[in-house]
Amino acid sequence: MVTTVISNVKRQSRASLVGKRNAGHRSAMSKLADRLAPCGPVLDPKAAERAYEAIAKRAGEAMGQVDAAWGSLAPVFAASPYLAGLARRDGKRLPRILGGDPGETLAAILAAAEAVAAEPDFETARRVLRELKADLHLLTAISDLGGVWDLDQVTGALTRFADAVLHAALAQAVRQEVSRGALTHVGDGSAGPAPGLFCVAMGKHGAFELNYSSDIDFSIFYAPEKLPVAEGHEPQAVAVRIANHLGRILQERTGDGYVFRIDLRLRPDPSSTPPAMPVDAAMDYYESVGQNWERAAHIKARIAAGDAAEGAAFLEGLQPFIWRRNLDFAAIADIHSIKRQIHTYKVDDRLTAKGADLKLGRGGIREIEFFVQTQQLILGGRQPDLRSPRTLDALQALAAAGHVTPEDAAWLTQAYKDLRALEHRAQMIADDQTHKLPESDVERKKVAALWGEGNLRVFDAAVGKMLKGVNLRYGRLFAGEEALSSRFGSLVFTGVEDDPETLATLKRMGFSSPERVAATIRGWHHGHIAATRTERGRELFTRLAPRLLDAANATGAPDQAFNRFSDFFSRLSSGVQIQSLFLAQPRLFELIVEVMAFAPRLAATMAKRPTALDALLDPTFFGPIETPAIAPWDPEDFEGAMDAARRLFRDQSFRIGVRVMSGTADARDIGRAFAELADLIIGGLAPAALAEVERIGGAFPGQVAVVALGKAGSREMTAKSDLDLMTLYVADDPRSMSALKDWSAEVFYARLTQRLTSALSAPTGEGTLYEVDLKLRPSGTKGPVAVSFAAFEHYYEREAETWELLALTRARVVWASSPDFKARAEGAIAAALRRPRAWKKTAADVIEMRQLMERERPGKGDWDLKLDPGGLVDIEFAAQFLQLAHAAADGPLRQNTGEALAALREAGLADAGALSRLEAAWRLEQDLSQLIKVALEDGADVEVEPKAFKALLAKAGGVTQFKSLKPKLAKAKAEARAAYEAVVKG
């Protein structure tokens, strides 16, 4: 019997199927079984036979209804395990549906669902609704696949059922709250089960366009003063529990299945609001931070359950938000962005059925909906005829008004119907909430069969052509405007759920957690941060978001760049000015994102103090680097001076660091700028420290100076340099004591040194400044922290070792209590350096010292620019040795290494070629060192850094590619090492 029936099933074309549907419209009420046509071929006869036998076991005498229609049912059950399961589970279900008029059967299902509202038992209500859902699903699928119902009838049946069960579920939820004493009674009539509370259907639910396995989108709102809350209970808590009850009733899976998945995320700001919201709070949200995609979503909004009058008043109040009569250019551009976030591909790009996302993919349903809704938002404020909630009705209205050509309207209408039909069939196979055609040919054949096509190649070609046609027409909308996608694909952040194509784009861009990035950006679009709280701020961010993601990708470290930008962006007090700057100066914005990726200290500065970016607004920012002439604080306020110094340091270091990252300043200028900043801070804090010591211990009759050594002294500082300092003092009278505490000169100036060291190094609420090292003073840690002038002269005349004299070549007086004492200190330093000394002994000491360093602190590899052979230490030793060797004969003395090498070459005091090679290596290593110190943590491996950083490093090194930099650096270091040995060993 089964084999005979299946063999008699003949494949029908799509045209004959449509004809059968049209015939169905004309028929009087009759049995569904008599009106069915086969939807396509029987792909799996064995599956159909198994379904037949299982149904027959349960149907009994009613199997005659099934036999009569089996020719039309076999293709369905052969392709859809889900539908076969519905028919098997209840033996009477399929015969009952086949034996009745589909319209009458639907009416009976809806009436039964409505009646559940009065069911006294909660669990019984849940079970009945699930059984009715099974009836509805089988009825709808057979009526659709059999050509009896068209798309409107299918989606209408699904939506009307959703409304009925939502009403019943709401009544059951209210009963639960009444039983616990939180509500006084269950309402009835137009006020609904809970007077003051209503459910707003959104999306396809709102437009009577539900798909087969759709969830239902609705929002729950309530007027607290009208909700019949019992004494001692809060309206908010009750409303939230009602929302939770709805979830249990509708979407919780039981042995009988589920009714509908529910989605409450279309309410205002769902990540930070309860599932049920007061009406006033919702209205405030839409009036202040409502987005254009939310306006589009509310085009389809209607009251599906609850207090009809309250709901109608709410929707009426939203009309000015949805339909704006006056839109400025920026607002129109922001509406366009809903469409422009989707990547527009060339029309000759292949679009295939295999794995196609019929809803969100290129050429899919969303593109048709956006095509319609964006134009509705722009035009509907002045043209009420365009406000239809239904996609196809609105498309026809746009065509009638001349905004869409009749040809495009007709083409998109048919494509929309076909896409929805395909979507339904993909879902009917297993009741999956999927919108994709299967990747597998075997599985895709099932969809094709349910669509009336037995040839997969023909099916795929037809689907591909349709997708391509939709995408082509969609791409022409607002053509020529700025794209808000990426070359990697779509970047859609509208709505409340992740867009699959956007997640794929973010993954291609290198983000390790696309979902987190998408959620963060959606939060910014929702106005969660001050920068996007205003409408203008959100409009600007819509344009900035794709540029941010592209710039983060370009760094090669997208996660770091995005995370640090997020820290910064979230702390802005407003966003219009800075976003406008970023959009107006894209290269500057890309630079800032590079800083975020590669310079954690600078990124932290921007995050903690976003006003640091104000410097970028200064037109002189990329001009000569200038340091303020005078410290901007009162030296009499020690604590205030410490905080002010840290603010100045942070701002100035940021300016200098950005110049390093941008490659717009010479490394020598950078080193000098960092040193001049240190000079300014020392020169401002030393008087403050002196005033503080005098406040505590009283004034002392004497003079004091601060001497910088090391890189601070030579003006070769980097972003991470510490301060090598020494304090020199002299008492007017060795027997003098401080005015209040009777401190001796040694105690007074030791206290001053300690106070200054603390001012320069201790953390405060404004951060830190420098690490301070006093070990280069005479006798190092064994000697007093402050050095008397006499002890200094004696030590460097009688006791200083060669390495200490080498260090002294970089000594520079950066502050003194009087000009006279500054000159006196400078004279003592010069005198110590210009004393006669034996060349050979000095050279031997230098060689021994360098060898000791190589044993105890060897270089760590090619990128150790300091200690590796031929690195900065070799070059500095060579320059310092030559200065020390020739100082007694009035040779040049320069603190800066580069200047010293140049002066020595000009004086002819060593082989010019060797000195030139040392100077060239020093310049290269300085260029690289400045960038590395700004960007990387200590010990970082340059080789594993992103390509974008390597490109910056190559640029700093004067080559076009990183692969050319390593041999250039190796050659420079080899030449520097040879020159060092030639100079020192003679």
Swiss-Prot record:
Residues 1-482 are annotated as: Adenylyl removase. Disulfide bonds: none annotated. The keyword ATP-binding applies. GO terms for molecular function: [glutamate-ammonia-ligase] adenylyltransferase activity; [glutamine synthetase]-adenylyl-L-tyrosine phosphorylase activity; ATP binding; magnesium ion binding. Its cofactor is Mg(2+). Its EC number is 2.7.7.89, 2.7.7.42. Pfam families: GlnD_UR_UTase, GlnE. Keywords: ATP-binding, Magnesium, Multifunctional enzyme, Nucleotide-binding, Nucleotidyltransferase, Transferase. GO terms for cellular component: cytosol. Residues 486-986 are annotated as: Adenylyl transferase. GO terms for biological process: regulation of glutamine family amino acid metabolic process. It catalyses: [glutamine synthetase]-O(4)-(5'-adenylyl)-L-tyrosine + phosphate = [glutamine synthetase]-L-tyrosine + ADP; [glutamine synthetase]-L-tyrosine + ATP = [glutamine synthetase]-O(4)-(5'-adenylyl)-L-tyrosine + diphosphate. NCBIfam families: PRK11072.1, PRK14108.1. Belongs to the GlnE family. Involved in the regulation of glutamine synthetase GlnA, a key enzyme in the process to assimilate ammonia. When cellular nitrogen levels are high, the C-terminal adenylyl transferase (AT) inactivates GlnA by covalent transfer of an adenylyl group from ATP to specific tyrosine residue of GlnA, thus reducing its activity. Conversely, when nitrogen levels are low, the N-terminal adenylyl removase (AR) activates GlnA by removing the adenylyl group by phosphorolysis, increasing its activity. This is Bifunctional glutamine synthetase adenylyltransferase/adenylyl-removing enzyme. It comes from Caulobacter vibrioides (strain ATCC 19089 / CIP 103742 / CB 15). The lineage of its organism: Bacteria, Pseudomonadati, Pseudomonadota, Alphaproteobacteria, Caulobacterales.
